[in-house]
Amino acid sequence: MAHSKEVPSFRWTQSLRRGLSQFTQTVKSDVLKDAKLIADSIDFNQVAQVQRALRKTKRGEEDLNKLRDLNKEVDRLMSMRSVQRNTVFKAGDLGRVERMELASGLGNLKTKFRRAETGSQGVYMGNLSQSQLAKRSEILRTLGFQQQGTGGNGVVRVWDVKDPSKLNNQFGSVPALTIACMTVQGGETMNSVIQALTSLGLLYTVKYPNLSDLDRLTQEHDCLQIVTKDESSINISGYNFSLSAAVKAGASILDDGNMLETIRVTPDNFSSLIKSTIQVKRREGMFIDEKPGNRNPYENLLYKLCLSGDGWPYIGSRSQIIGRSWDNTSIDLTRKPVAGPRQPEKNGQNLRLANLTEIQEAVIREAVGKLDPTNTLWLDIEGPATDPVEMALFQPAGSKYIHCFRKPHDEKGFKNGSRHSHGILMKDIEDAMPGVLSYVIGLLPPDMVVTTQGSDDIRKLFDLHGRRDLKLVDVRLTSEQARQFDQQVWEKFGHLCKHHNGVVVSKKKRDKDAPFKLASSEPHCALLDCIMFQSVLDGKLYEEELTPLLPPSLLFLPKAAYAL
């Protein structure tokens, strides 16, 4: 369906920022680390050659090869990149209506892109090569026919290549690359570039910066003179100094602001991201316009989110991804036949990952089904809510528990947490089965009450999984109270968890007058912490033998066997 009404573009952007704020983060240090590495390592003679090629009105195979080779080198240098991860949303990942909306949206995006790429305003393309199409246009102009589908400046830049699919994902700006190029090619210090782009980013929090704004800011920040005043167009590369590239870079280095540019898609949050996006879309009446032209904020977000299920949709390197959004994210609208009564779907259930088979999902469903929603259920995690590495659910009545692990995305943050809190080593959880933690959260009974010691992280974890229905009771023990049974619990139940093998060092500095005490202490294990908290409430050590509800074979990927 075509929509002719005007899009309130910036209002939509602000609404999406608010609605997806829980998925945004501060990424300035990561962007600058990549920018410095690119500035120090890349051959800027190659950059200049690519920029020259992209200024040509007709570009061929050699030009594309130069662009792809340079993009590959940039991708190799960057830590912030999107990787190839195809996703199929099925029943349980999203509600049926949400899946239908997503399928329709991706279909409309595909139509919009195809029309833009083929110049479809009633012009039959036929099975012609780019060079033949260009020749045909030249003949039509000679005969006095008006060229259809050209831009306002009459310039049509043409890629004459044998395989057009090689053009996919080779364009679009990357803030780290923009900052590096502005610094080196502009002969500036990186600090002055950062200050200038930060000003643009701050302006972007209240309006779309335009060329008049750029002129005014250039008076204060001389380095912005490098930003081109040409109108943006499709298929411009990250090596162009466009205003939109500068604004995106500025947005990425703001310390806060809930900027969409700082969203990261992971296998654990993908379905929650899509749910939240659809909620904002419905509330604001957003739509996809199939007519060729610039993408509106909703179209832009949906396309970027669905390009890869793992990476940085706006600001990461994505040149090594194959395919488009509608190729890499697909929707299964069928209903699977089930034997016996079907469990009601949980609105908050997260994305089913390819690593979990139907049998594994059935085992997890059975395990969660054994938890009694009418009795106390403790839940604790290790690691931040946005990147947890361990989760435990412990039900004292019945002596049952679910205990699982997850490989982190943020290795630096993980090492810091290991040193000062949980003592988990990467080698001990790198084979953790992906998807178990999120699947368990998605299966918890609706409106269940969960008991915690400190609820902020748990609330955020549930919100990220779309489980706002779950209720939390925070017992609010002091640090001393919570660790009262520390040694006794580790002695009795330490055999239940063998994944806390690092040395934990206290962050607190010792008072110079205090007696000497070893800085190391017992690590925090999510399962054993739950037992400690229950012991504190009981006023004595919990003594019952515990039963795991998940088999060990489900928690970790099988080790490869080597024959000698």
UniProtKB/Swiss-Prot annotation:
Keywords: Capsid protein, Helical capsid protein, Host cytoplasm, Host-virus interaction, Hydrolase, Inhibition of host IKBKE by virus, Inhibition of host innate immune response by virus, Inhibition of host RLR pathway by virus, Interferon antiviral system evasion, Manganese, Metal-binding, Ribonucleoprotein, RNA-binding, Viral immunoevasion, Viral nucleoprotein, Virion, Zinc. It comes from the Viruses. Pfam families: Arena_ncap_C (PF17290), Arena_nucleocap (PF00843). One of its GO terms (cellular component) is ribonucleoprotein complex. Its main location: virion. Mn(2+) binds at D380, E382, D529. Encapsidates the genome, protecting it from nucleases. The encapsidated genomic RNA is termed the nucleocapsid (NC). Serves as template for viral transcription and replication. The increased presence of protein N in host cell does not seem to trigger the switch from transcription to replication as observed in other negative strain RNA viruses. The N-terminal region is important for the cap-binding activity while the C-terminal region contains the 3'-5' exoribonuclease activity. A CCHE zinc binding site is present in the C-terminal region and may thus contribute to the substrate binding and/or the specificity of the exonuclease activity. This is Nucleoprotein. It comes from Junin mammarenavirus (JUNV). The gene is N.
